[in-house]
């Protein structure tokens, strides 16, 4: 569940639209699927039209341009947690949910709050997500 004050979620380096499409289907939040590749955006636009989903948008752009603007971001494979911390501007309205490898991060705890979440996808596989907030 996303915090009530989130109006727009940007799925950076979306690829096939995961997790952005799922967020768009299950919420009324505006979801921007951002990817630099024209073919991906074309296919995602077709999928959005088939789903008749009016709160999800496919945008062809460099995801790093959006990181610099701040906001609420999700990413499955686009960027590592370490690169997120190095790329984020210190905007207190920035939150980033990113899949990770579960390793400890080297970051300035005065600037960032990082919460590591682990979850099982079956009895043997664990996945990791880092929730990174600018303080």
Short names for language-model regions:
Residues 16-28:
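Conserved SAM-binding loop of SAM-dependent methyltransferases across substrates and taxa
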Residues 1-5, 65-67:
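Glycine-rich helix-loop-beta junction characteristic of Rossmann-like nucleotide cofactor-binding loops
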Residues 22, 32, 36-135:
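S-adenosylmethionine
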Residues 5-15:
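Conserved class I S-adenosyl-L-methionine
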Residues 13-16, 77-79:
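N-terminal glycine-rich "phosphate-gripper" loop used for MgATP/nucleotide binding
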């Amino acid at each position: 569940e996303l915090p009530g004050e989130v109006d727009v979620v940007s799925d950076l380096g979306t690829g096939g639209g995961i997790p952005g499409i799922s967020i768009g289907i299950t919420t009324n939040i505006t979801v921007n699927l951002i990817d630099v590749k024209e073919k991906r955006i074309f296919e995602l636009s077709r999928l959005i039209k088939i789903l008749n989903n009016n709160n999800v948008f496919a945008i062809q752009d460099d995801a790093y341009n959006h990181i610099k603007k701040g906001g609420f971001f999700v990413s499955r494979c686009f960027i590592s947690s370490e690169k997120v911390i190095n790329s984020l501007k210190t905007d207190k309205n920035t939150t980033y949910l990113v899949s990770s490898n579960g390793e400890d991060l080297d970051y300035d705890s005065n600037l960032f709050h990082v919460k590591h979440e682990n979850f099982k996808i079956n009895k043997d596989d664990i996945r990791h997500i880092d929730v990174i907030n600018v303080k």
